[in-house]
Regions:
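SAM-dependent methyltransferases
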Residues: 1-2, 23-24, 49, 58, ...
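C-terminal binding/interaction regions
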Residues: 2-6, 10-13, 89-145
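Short active-site oxyanion
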Residues: 2-3, 58-61, 80-82
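A short beta-strand-loop structural module common to alpha/beta enzyme folds
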Residues: 28-39
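Short, structured active-site "lid" loops
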Residues: 45-63, 67
């Protein structure tokens, strides 16, 4: 799969670890920044990653900031995005299987690389179940119109 990834300065180190895991899993990764520890604004990263997912240039996205909250709020402002904040493997599985989340958000100040890498692996490997969940996702999509 093609994965768009991005972070603000608060997620720079975790992003490096996640990129290694994605590559090891055989995914093609496009990094939308940031690339230094210099302070930056997370919406400036979230929007291009979200647009890559919505346009089909990327199959899924991963966004990382200090908490995963702000960058996810910004991404969810883009129509067609279902960004899910996950700091445990259960949520990573459920957000894909039940909610068809297309962007994963995480916080570097909340979790370490070991857990983050497990979350990313599950997020990438879990498919949307459809069925009763498809009806619910369609209702979410209808809210954007």
């Amino acid at each position: 799969m093609k994965v768009a990834i991005g972070c603000d300065h608060g997620g720079l180190n975790l992003k490096a670890s996640v990129k290694e895991v994605l590559s090891a899993l055989g995914h093609e990764v496009e990094d939308f920044g940031c690339h230094t520890a210099e302070s930056c604004d997370y919406p400036d990263i979230a929007v291009p990653v979200a647009n890559a997912v919505v346009s089909g240039k990327a199959d899924r996205g991963i966004l990382i900031c200090g908490t995963g909250i702000g960058i996810g709020i910004a991404a969810n402002k883009i129509a067609g995005i279902r960004a899910a904040l996950c700091h445990d493997t259960f949520s990573a599985h459920a957000c894909r299987e039940h909610n068809d989340a297309n962007i994963l958000t995480m916080g570097e100040r909340v979790i370490g690389p070991g857990l983050a890498n497990d979350i990313v692996t599950i997020f990438m490997e879990t498919e949307f179940e459809g069925g009763r969940h498809a009806r619910r996702v369609e209702k979410i999509k209808a809210l954007e119109k």
